[in-house]
Amino acid sequence: MTQVPAPLEIKLHKRSKTLELVYADGQFELTAEFLRVHSPSAEVRGHGIGQEVLQTGKKFVGISGLEASGNYALKIIFDDGHDSGLYTWPYLHDLAHNQATYWQAYLDRLTAAGESRDKGLIALG
């Protein structure tokens, strides 16, 4: 089994709310919303199969900061207060390489649940 390497570069773009990951096999930009709704935390994934919690209303979430967790993961601190997920190098690599598939599956789950990405937000003006 081949070991998934850490990204060669990690860049946080606060204005565009994206995390740029550079690997030997490509460069990827993951939105804060995508990362937030796919957090590996128990708060999102639950403690077992069927206990996942669908994340709604995260369209405008941003990333406040990043912290290395040893040599194996990245802790992402979101501006909605969520900071309990450790994104391991293999998990980030998987998210980057399968972003389109995972995003569509998330949108399908939202639709099936009658929920939305911007739930509870009030449009002004």
Task: Identify what each model region corresponds to.
Residues 1-125:
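Motif-centric detector for short Cys/His coordination patterns
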